[in-house]
Swiss-Prot record:
ADP binds at G154, V155, S156, R157, A158, G159, K160, T161. It holds the Pfam family Kinase-PPPase. Belongs to the pyruvate, phosphate/water dikinase regulatory protein family. PSRP subfamily. The keyword Kinase applies. Its EC number is 2.7.11.33, 2.7.4.28. The lineage of its organism: Bacteria, Thermotogati, Deinococcota, Deinococci, Deinococcales. This is Putative phosphoenolpyruvate synthase regulatory protein. Signal peptide: none annotated. It comes from Deinococcus geothermalis (strain DSM 11300 / CIP 105573 / AG-3a). It is an enzyme of class 2 (transferase). Transmembrane segments: none annotated. It comes from the Bacteria. It catalyses: [pyruvate, water dikinase] + ADP = [pyruvate, water dikinase]-phosphate + AMP + H(+); [pyruvate, water dikinase]-phosphate + phosphate + H(+) = [pyruvate, water dikinase] + diphosphate.
Length: 270
């Protein structure tokens, strides 16, 4: 049975980009879950936080238990969120407390502190790469592929999205990703949007049995999740990669960090 949809609220005292990226990176490890994301940025006062708490209460009345991912550092605002009928994930609090003990001083805990970093250029580059990855995720925005550093290609649920987001946030790499579908296999050639960008393509493959397990969690009993379909798609994708001369990385037992490291090494080799 497919699990019911869960609402994920991204709550921040600033833009929410940091909170959303971290939340998506964590939740990408649970592909069977059906999730709806709601962004609630600039929650910098108790009054605004109470409004978010009321929204959560309304969801709870319908039988849902929302998830809140937050980078709020103001204790009074945080208390309002923690009182709401939701599972709250404090993305900064535990780390700040540990650092306070380590350094022997209190954290500044000012609104948007992360965005006042000395290395503003690096931060802006990562946020730009993140915006690009989200805008060109899962085949979207293919007209922007000319601006990409790398385009990840593979069948559905091979690990393209979490790898793209990791490359963007950790390495400022503009990573797009494109899902291969049956129409592409029938053509026996690269999808038209990818043709002009062969040098940027990097294939991701996966063991069909592992793919079957992942898809079964998401859509049990469907043709999409059947082992036969998974074997067919992986086989056809690998043939396509071979014909096009695209470098390929197996994601079956690799972490996102390991996949990204291999792609970065390939990019450095040119």
């Amino acid at each position: 049975m497919t699990p019911p949809s869960r609402t994920v609220l991204i709550v921040s005292d600033h833009t929410g980009l940091t909170a959303e990226t971290t939340a998506r990176a964590l939740l990408a490890h649970f592909p069977s879950q059906s999730l709806k994301y709601l962004q609630r940025p600039f929650v910098a006062s108790v009054e605004v936080a109470r409004g978010v708490a009321r929204e959560v209460a309304a969801l709870a009345e319908r039988g849902e238990r929302p998830l809140i991912f937050t980078t709020i550092t103001e204790p009074a605002v945080m208390r309002e969120l923690e009182a709401a009928p939701a599972r709250v994930f404090d993305l900064l609090g535990p780390g700040l407390i540990a650092l306070e003990h380590e350094f022997g001083e209190k954290a500044a805990r000012s609104v948007g502190r992360y965005h006042d970093m000395h290395d503003q250029t690096s931060y802006l580059a990562r946020m730009d790469a993140l915006d690009f990855a989200l805008a060109t995720d899962d085949g979207l925005g293919d007209r922007q592929y000319g601006l990409a550093d790398v385009i990840l290609v593979g069948v559905s649920r091979a690990g393209k999205t979490p790898t793209s987001l990791f490359l963007a946030l950790q390495h400022s790499v503009r990573a797009s990703n494109y899902p291969l579908a049956e129409d592409d296999f029938e053509r026996e050639s690269l999808p038209i949007p990818l043709e002009p960008h062969r040098a940027k393509l990097h294939g991701l493959t996966i063991d069909p049995r592992r793919l079957h397990a992942i898809r079964t969690q998401r859509k049990p009993g469907s043709r999409y999740a059947s082992l036969e379909q998974c074997e067919y798609e992986v086989r056809q994708a690998e043939r396509l990669f071979g014909r096009a001369g695209i470098p390929v990385r197996d994601t079956t037992s690799a972490s996102v960090e390991e996949i990204a490291a291999g792609i970065l090494a390939q990019l450095r080799r040119g």
